[in-house]
């Protein structure tokens, strides 16, 4: 028995909600996966804040047609598709899918869409290899901390060098007076 119009409208609203919250959407062919395997994929995606959803291509087509950021996905809507909505940890979600794909060897990656662009397998893999947001923040914080440490060491050295210079002035004046005095004595003796 088919779904009622109201059920389809609710599913469409859910798809649109997932798209609006996602940074990247992947399309995979899930033909041959068991319910347990799809559940396993969904569990792997949970820690990354991502979702695996199975929807009819016609419903997904309606959802993406209304949003220019997702329109390129229309080219991928054929066959038995599962949709991965990647929201927070994109790299972690892609790696979770890749690990799942290696374990099952049953899914086929069809493509992805990000910021209105259709992405192939290599482009998605390149995104997965980027550091996570937390790693980037840690790198920036480390760089700022390193600069602050070097600045503190440099500023600490300035008073020391200034004190050495101030102490050297009287000694230099003393040497200059002595040299002048010695020169005058040599001039008197001659």
From Swiss-Prot:
Protein origin, superkingdom: Bacteria
Keyword rRNA-binding: yes
Annotated keywords: Ribonucleoprotein, Ribosomal protein, RNA-binding, rRNA-binding
SUPFAM superfamilies: Ribosomal protein L10-like
One GO CC annotation: large ribosomal subunit
Function: Forms part of the ribosomal stalk, playing a central role in the interaction of the ribosome with GTP-bound translation factors.
Family in the record: Belongs to the universal ribosomal protein uL10 family.
Quaternary structure (record): Part of the ribosomal stalk of the 50S ribosomal subunit. The N-terminus interacts with L11 and the large rRNA to form the base of the stalk. The C-terminus forms an elongated spine to which L12 dimers bind in a sequential fashion forming a multimeric L10(L12)X complex.
Protein's recorded name: Large ribosomal subunit protein uL10
